[in-house]
Amino acid sequence: MPTIAPLSSPPQSQEQLLAQARQLAGYSLGELAALAGIPIPRDLKRDKGWTGILLELWLGASAGSKPEQDFAALGVELKTIPIDSRGRPLETTFVCVAPLTGNSGVTWESSHVRHKLQRVLWIPVEGERTIPLAARRVGAPLLWSPDEDEERQLRMDWEELMDLIVLGEVERITARHGEVLQLRPKAANSKALTEAIGAHGETILTLPRGFYLKKNFTAALLARHFLLQHD
């Protein structure tokens, strides 16, 4: 394989970003960590975001966990996605934190979810636990925007979930709500509470919630992409 190096500054175009991502395909996480000079944890139990941080470093990402996209100047969000040996996602994909108050007048068009999913660079990574972290390989990238049907599905779920939040029913929402988008607690510990609207319009304290793409949505997206690649 030719020698590769992390981008020293943010990519100037989507084409440059995709070209760099394609160069990473086939490398293991251990190889990429060694080439970048960063330590590799033994597993991801305490370093769940490590894979994403490693790939952000290689791709010159700038945003970190701020509200704008990882490649804000290009309008592109980076999503690493752990897959099994058949290329299927192993977990749901975090999109963004859900606003539980101050939602009057909010629309799908102006939502964080739509903003984050307008243009996504998907990078599949081997994720089966039987494969040591350092040996897991990076797959071929996909630069994606939702088509009309995908956007319609996302919008319908987002509107249903936001209606429940505004109506004070956030505590009733389960991971089963939504066809392709779900809302569920996002907190490292159950003491981190945030304000929300209660059933009678009062302010309540509840766990922060996050929007996640369900596996059926990302599985279909990846399957279409890789079938096209293999034609």
Swiss-Prot record:
It comes from the Bacteria. SMART domains: MutH. It is found in: Cytoplasm. One of its GO terms (molecular function) is DNA binding. GO terms for biological process: DNA modification; mismatch repair. GO terms for cellular component: cytoplasm. Its main location: cytoplasm. Keywords: Cytoplasm, DNA damage, DNA repair, Endonuclease, Hydrolase, Nuclease. HAMAP family: MutH (MF_00759). Sequence-specific endonuclease that cleaves unmethylated GATC sequences. It is involved in DNA mismatch repair. Belongs to the MutH family. This is DNA mismatch repair protein MutH. It comes from Klebsiella pneumoniae (strain 342). The gene is mutH.
